[in-house]
């Protein structure tokens, strides 16, 4: 073992072991040719049961993530695209925050806040979003007494990340290019 690994926290080493095991499983030779087939769609699924949007609206999405998110077809299209890239956690977090803001009951708000935290914010959460430690700490402090604004800072950071990274990839994708034809 190299000297650098000893300095890593135990949780990092455990995570590295888990990844090594998963990679080992993926690298095993298949027993049959049928095992080689991985059920993966190269193109994202088109959104179902959502009224198609106009060309003008779709063209506006290039410049405005907010316009995309406010349009049901745009949101469904964006979500399908992100799913095809296995990177939908940021959008799912943003949607969960929007749903959270609609809650009126303090008890339900506390329950939903805990659920969002466990699913997206806490370290090694199933759909952990990429936010800095400062934002994570502020969010955790806000959850001591949940309010409608508890996730605002984290949601703004994720919105900025989607605007800077996910939206440009979506706009360059074949899927979006077909939408605007």
UniProtKB/Swiss-Prot annotation:
Start and end residues of each RGS domain: 64-180
Tagged with keyword Membrane: yes
SUPFAM superfamilies assigned: Regulator of G-protein signaling, RGS
GO biological process, one term: G protein-coupled receptor signaling pathway
Function as written in the Swiss-Prot or TrEMBL entry: Inhibits signal transduction by increasing the GTPase activity of G protein alpha subunits thereby driving them into their inactive GDP-bound form. Binds to G(i)-alpha and G(o)-alpha, but not to G(s)-alpha.
Annotated S-S bridges: none
Database matches in SMART domains: RGS (SM00315)
GO CC list: cytosol; intracellular membrane-bounded organelle; plasma membrane
Protein name: Regulator of G-protein signaling 5
Single GO term (MF): GTPase activator activity
Swiss-Prot/TrEMBL keywords: Cytoplasm, Membrane, Signal transduction inhibitor
